[in-house]
Amino acid sequence: MLASRPEGDTRFRNQSKTMTARQKALIIDDEPDIRELLEITLGRMKLDTRSARNLKEARELLAREHYDLCLTDMRLPDGSGLELVQHIQQQYPQLPVAMITAYGSLDTAIGALKAGAFDFLTKPVDLNRLRELVSTALRLRAPDAALMAVP
């Protein structure tokens, strides 16, 4: 027997909106273990993820889908993560990008930030720092997303 719900009960309707409005992150790293770690961590934060192994795949995914956040490795098989940051700044300026690299020198961090990266992480990735970075990026992006939704 099905229980009836009051006509004003919006719990189920609101729940379905929440489930379909998940934010999406693009992860670019040529190391499968790092990609998997990032996918699992962001998935537990209720983000959908897509992954690319190189610049070419990343550009293809960016052209096909909308993303709320991008995490990219500095050194990729077909170029530099800085190239991707510059591409995103030109084509998708509202998309926050964080650089992840094993080469954690101050010069590298400054280069990433000058290119337009939102933030910078070093490998091995500190998961607490990653979660903070992701939460901050999504909070800062929220006003942009709300403005884009206004007719």
Where in this protein do the model-derived segments appear?
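The feature encodes the CheY-like receiver
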Residues: 35, 77, 105
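Acidic, metal-coordinating helix/loop segments flanking the phosphotransfer/catalytic sites
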Residues: 26, 51-69
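Short amphipathic alpha-helix used as the core "switch/output" element in two-component signaling
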Residues: 60, 75, 82-94, 111
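Two-component/phosphorelay signaling modules centered on CheY-like receiver
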Residues: 32-50
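C-terminal output helix
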Residues: 107, 121, 125-135
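Active-site residues of response regulator receiver
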Residues: 73, 101
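Acidic catalytic/metal-coordinating carboxylates
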Residues: 54, 80-83
